[in-house]
Amino acid sequence: MPQNTLNIVILAAGKGTRMYSKMPKVLHEIGGETMLGRVIDTAAALNPQNICVVVGHGKEQVLDTVKRDVVWVEQTEQLGTGHAVKTALPHLAAEGRTLVLYGDVPLIDVETLETLLEAAGNEVGLLTDVPADPSGLGRIIRDSSGSVTAIVEEKDADAAQKAVKEINTGILVLPNAKLEAWLNSLSSNNAQGEYYLTDLIAKAVADGIKIHPVQVRSSHLAAGVNNKLQLAELERIFQTEQAQELLKAGVTLRDPARFDLRGRLKHGQDVVIDVNCIFEGKIELGDNVEIGANCVIKNAKIGANSKIAPFSHLEGCEVGENNQIGPYARLRPQAKLADDVHVGNFVEIKNAAIGKGTKANHLTYIGDAEVGSKTNFGAGTIIANYDGVHKHKTVIGDEVRIGSNCVLVSPVKIGNKVTTGAGSTITRNVEDGKLALARSRQTIIDGWVRPEKNKQ
């Protein structure tokens, strides 16, 4: 097998006690994706022979949540990082290299790992950092010539070693030909009573194998998450980087510090996004799209020149060109709007196709429907699509005028150019061009005396 064969082991067995959560630590999210999912995707971009993920606490929940084509290996006892890698040995090639990553180091990137792999060659590569505060972290020990000789965990370090600022990030590259022997020779005779993966550095030095340290270009790339504060700090760094990339690409963000992207955003030119907007999943924004403040948009496609007014919520929908949506509008999954559609305040559309030029400007629910072009919904229109057991479809033609406060009881068909009187409850099909009225006649009672409060 060629020496450049790459295996990747991702350690994800920890409980994450300091997260104070019933959820396994690696399932907490950065930018709308689990930390472990992010690390696996980064690892996959290196085109390894295989990826082994070592799981332990919450194994079933991890496997159910993180749907990836990897080898899952269970560490039944939490005996340290060295023991965790050892559990993956049966799945690693006899030759080549193994890169060790961590499921709670979510922002590690391909560029950093490629640099480390190149530096390591077929020897040992070690990713290091010099953080502002190295407390609690393993120190990189060098000899008088500057060569790395060992990593000492802080609990096992003496005063001189604790004074060292350079720390071990935990990410390293190891030659497979030596890996099994080194792991089998590990001892748990230390302050933690665990098998430290970091002890392999001293073993490599003893075997005459050179250690190639690479300092990470920015501390956050190798930062681990142990509590919710650290999770929030990395989330903000991640969001800042995404905002910067969008700004460089020509998107106008009214305030980059108040923007969240939890997925992928494809955009045209002259897109404007106001403050406090959240984008989730796969988003596509056409040219000249404007998103008002405080909108939530998830898995949506919005056509050119469309305006989404503040406080609107769009999910799983398609919006055509030149649409006016909101404020306070809600487009639910399978809502498909053609061009020049107006959807106003407190209008909800779900699983409905809306034709070109149609308007629903106020207080309307359109569900499980097919609506033609240039139709107008009066305020308070409701499509009653659910009978308590099944959903039913309503079909409405072109140039229909639905009066205010109407109820269309599905299934029903409304023909082209139909008008329904305000306050009508429509339960039967209406042919083209007809006027449909379904309400009781107004009665005026003369001589009626209105009750008054007794003033005493």
UniProtKB/Swiss-Prot annotation:
Localization: Cytoplasm
E.C. designation(s): 2.7.7.23, 2.3.1.157
Reaction catalysis annotation: alpha-D-glucosamine 1-phosphate + acetyl-CoA = N-acetyl-alpha-D-glucosamine 1-phosphate + CoA + H(+); N-acetyl-alpha-D-glucosamine 1-phosphate + UTP + H(+) = UDP-N-acetyl-alpha-D-glucosamine + diphosphate
Cofactor binding note of this UniProt entry: Binds 1 Mg(2+) ion per subunit.
Catalytic residues, chain numbering: 362
Residues where UDP-N-acetyl-alpha-D-glucosamine binds: 11-14, 25, 75, 80-81, 102-104, 138, 153, 168, 226, 332, 350, 365, 376
Coiled-coil blocks: none
Job of this protein: Catalyzes the last two sequential reactions in the de novo biosynthetic pathway for UDP-N-acetylglucosamine (UDP-GlcNAc). The C-terminal domain catalyzes the transfer of acetyl group from acetyl coenzyme A to glucosamine-1-phosphate (GlcN-1-P) to produce N-acetylglucosamine-1-phosphate (GlcNAc-1-P), which is converted into UDP-GlcNAc by the transfer of uridine 5-monophosphate (from uridine 5-triphosphate), a reaction catalyzed by the N-terminal domain.
Protein name, UniProt field: Bifunctional protein GlmU
Source organism of this protein record: Neisseria meningitidis serogroup A / serotype 4A (strain DSM 15465 / Z2491)
